[in-house]
Amino acid sequence: SYLYWNMILEPWGRSTWGDPQNAMVTVDPGQKRAVFNPDFYVMKHFSNPIRPDAVRLGIKGHMAADSLLFRNPDGSYVVEAFNPFPEEKDLIVELEGERLSFTLAGESFNSMILQK
């Protein structure tokens, strides 16, 4: 499980102890407008395909520092992969004897659901 401390703040929001904070959603009360910030979309990547009781599995290789692998209770796998580089990168996933290749766009965050 994960707890996101500041889900919604005003622009240039501060914590209760006065430190500047980021939030998933910024709400400007003067304009009555909500802005969905990058953290919101990262949370969406994780919360949508990864189901309750999923298990995080080990991962290795050149993209391991920027990738996570989960097995959902239904047997599907979820790969979450971040490409911090400006150029495309190939991600190769080997699961149950099968080799799959994905091209990650530069500076992108990716969610892949792999069915058995």
Give a label for each model feature.
Residues 103-116:
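C-terminal beta-strand-rich structural cap/linker in extracellular carbohydrate-active enzymes
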Residues 1-41:
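Aromatic/acidic polysaccharide-binding cleft in carbohydrate-active enzymes
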Residues 5-7, 57-61:
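Acidic carboxylate-rich catalytic motifs and surrounding loops in phosphoryl-/glycosyl-chemistry enzymes
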Residues 50, 54-56:
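Edge strands and adjacent loops of beta-rich recognition modules
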Residues 1-2, 52, 75:
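Loop/turn elements at helix/coil->beta-strand transitions in domains of secreted/extracellular proteins
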Residues 13-16, 90-93, 114:
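Short conserved micro-motifs at the rims of enzyme active sites and ligand-binding pockets
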Residues 45-48, 59-96, 107:
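Carbohydrate-binding surface patches
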Residues 98-101:
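Surface-exposed loop/edge segments in extracytoplasmic proteins
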